[in-house]
A protein has these predicted regions:
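Conserved serine/cysteine hydrolase catalytic core
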Residues: 47-55, 72
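Acidic catalytic loop of the alpha/beta-hydrolase fold
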Residues: 10, 65-69
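Mobile cap/lid helix-loop segments that gate and shape the active-site cleft of serine hydrolases
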Residues: 12-50
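Short beta-strand/loop motif that positions the catalytic acidic residue
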Residues: 54, 59-62, 66
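Hydrophobic pocket-lining residues within nucleotide cofactor-binding pockets
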Residues: 8-10, 47, 97
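C-terminal catalytic histidine-bearing segment of alpha/beta-hydrolase fold enzymes
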Residues: 61, 71-134
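Active-site nucleophile loop of the alpha/beta-hydrolase fold
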Residues: 2-12
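Short, flexible helix/strand-to-coil boundary loops that buttress conserved ligand/catalytic motifs
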Residues: 14, 54, 105
Length: 134
């Protein structure tokens, strides 16, 4: 899995510090309320709660100055992966990079492509070794 600026904490839109009213409205429709009124639903849609030893490897890519998805959200998911599953997951945080940096062919977007290629190649090579394929 390679989420680029993925959403990992669905309670963030309800935060008084960083509110996101549009996201909060959608989440209220999905869960039928807020994290306080429908905690079970929010637990079910929180990716960190589903991490196990069977979780596939992740390459998490996140801009450090992303105003929509706080980098701490991605870091928290990374820590969940590390605590429950150590299977070749990686976290790449990009200094001074905002949300949606890959929409236009910027230098940053171009530099990410070889990183993703190398990550996938490493996973493939590990799979080949595990299977005993030559």
């Amino acid at each position: 899995c390679i989420p680029v600026y993925g959403v990992f904490d669905f309670s963030t839109p309800f935060s008084k510090k960083t509110p996101y009213p549009a996201k909060a409205r959608v989440l209220k429709m999905v869960c039928g309320g807020t994290p306080e009124t429908e905690p079970e639903c929010y637990q079910q849609i929180t990716p960190a709660n589903w991490v196990s030893k069977k979780t596939p490897p992740f390459l998490l890519i996140q801009g450090e100055t992303d105003a929509l998805i706080p980098v701490k959200e991605t870091q928290a998911f990374w820590h969940a992966l590390q605590s429950k599953n150590r299977r070749h997951s990686a976290l790449l945080t990009l200094p001074l990079i905002e949300h949606a940096f890959d929409i236009y062919p910027t230098l940053t977007a171009q530099c990410i492509v070889p990183v993703i290629e190398q990550y996938l190649l490493m996973l493939h090579e590990n799979y080949i070794k595990q299977q005993g394929i030559k």
